[in-house]
Regions:
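Bilobed periplasmic-binding protein-like "clamshell/Venus-flytrap" ligand-binding domains
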Residues: 1, 63-92, 202, 206-261
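Short, solvent-exposed loop/beta-turn-alpha elements that line the ligand-binding surface or hinge
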Residues: 7-58, 73-82, 136, 162-218, ...
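Short, solvent-exposed loop/turn and secondary-structure capping segments
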Residues: 1-4, 61, 98-104, 155-160, ...
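Ligand/substrate-recognition segments at binding pockets and active sites
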Residues: 29-30, 34-152, 228-231, 256
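Generic hydrophobic alpha-helical scaffold/packing signal
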Residues: 61, 105, 134, 138, ...
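Short, well-ordered loop/turn and helix-capping segments at boundaries between secondary-structure elements
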Residues: 139, 151, 166-170, 204, ...
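Hydrophobic/aromatic-lined pockets within catalytic cores
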Residues: 6, 10-11, 15, 109, ...
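Aromatic-acidic/polar surface patches that form glycan- and anion
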Residues: 53, 97, 191, 224, ...
Length: 307
């Protein structure tokens, strides 16, 4: 749910994703927990996470068939019915959305080949949503969105979680976070409260939690409370709960790339949030004067190999 660019501790620059509890969320979600450890498939959680691609066509096709059988058995569709999927776009004037739409349609169409859904998927688009994409999804006017969503709060993942758990912000109207219960282990004790109550707790509100033995106590872990480690653990548990709803499905990713010249050195080769790697021109240093650079290029036969 959260990328490496979400910072859990602005004072230290530590990203949310770098913490062990956040790593475990991913390992658990992708079903790799039993495969991590000495002598197992993955030595560390980092190794396991590195292996995650989210792509397993054979398993996906099994699930397509299972979903089809369930839908027919429950009377949600009849054999031979078409499944209509409307993808919402803010507009159709940019390549990102038009090409993205084509990409998703092709991927799903090809993925169901050989399954009971082959030839039964029909895609349409609504490219008139503009900034109203969230309301359109909540009102079931569209079935899928991509390339849109919440931004901001990169330095406050605790506040950002409200976008996925609150009635005012979340896209999924079917998930009642005030009644969905979530158990979080804190200091060796398992405590249970609703998803929404846990969210309130990390925002500084006092809530009542129930321990495994049935006893109740109060809990709060806001910005000013002296239990930031527990606050982080609750946030991780909330991320896991959101992922388990399977409403946020990783479908696409985008990135940018730049070629670093042999003529310069960056201030650091490590990414720094808000700065990047080179931190603007004032942090660049040059390895050659213009004359030295000309000589260097000539010494390489006039062509530099950046492979």
């Amino acid at each position: 749910l959260y990328s490496d660019l979400i910072i859990a501790n602005p004072e230290t620059g530590e990203s949310y994703r770098s913490g062990e509890a956040a790593k475990k969320v991913l390992v658990d979600f992708w079903g790799l927990s039993d495969e991590v450890g000495s002598g197992k498939m993955y030595e560390t959680m980092d190794d396991a996470i590195e292996s995650i691609t989210g792509y397993n066509l054979a398993l996906a096709q099994e699930k397509f068939d299972e979903a089809y059988d369930i839908a027919v058995a429950q009377g949600l569709m009849k054999e031979g019915d078409k499944v209509q999927i409307k993808i919402g776009l803010p507009n159709s004037t940019t390549n990102f959305y038009t090409k993205g739409y084509e990409f998703l349609v092709n991927c799903y169409t090809e993925a169901v080949v050989g399954t009971k859904l082959e030839g039964k998927l029909e895609f349409t688009m609504d490219d008139t949503l503009g900034n109203g994409f969230g309301n359109a999804l909540r009102a079931n006017q569209v079935d899928m969105l991509f390339g849109v969503g919440w931004n901001g709060s990169a330095l406050d993942p605790y506040n950002l979680m409200e976008a996925y758990t609150s009635e005012d912000y979340r896209y999924n109207r079917c998930w009642d976070t005030s009644s969905e219960m979530l158990t979080v282990e804190l200091n060796g004790v398992e405590y249970t409260a609703s998803v929404w109550d846990w969210n309130e707790a990390i925002m500084g509100e006092e809530i009542t939690v129930k321990a495994a033995d049935g006893t109740t106590s109060t809990f709060r872990a806001g910005t000013s409370d002296d239990n930031q480690e527990e606050r982080y653990l609750v946030l991780c548990a909330l991320e896991g709960a959101v992922l388990e709803t399977y409403e946020m499905i990783p479908m696409i990713d985008n990135s940018t790339a730049a070629l670093k010249s042999m003529q310069v050195e960056f201030y650091t080769e490590e990414y720094i949030y808000g700065v990047g790697r080179h931190g603007d021109f004032k942090y660049l240093t040059y390895d050659y004067s213009d004359a030295e650079w000309t000589d260097f290029v000539a010494s390489q036969g006039g062509q530099l190999n950046y492979n």
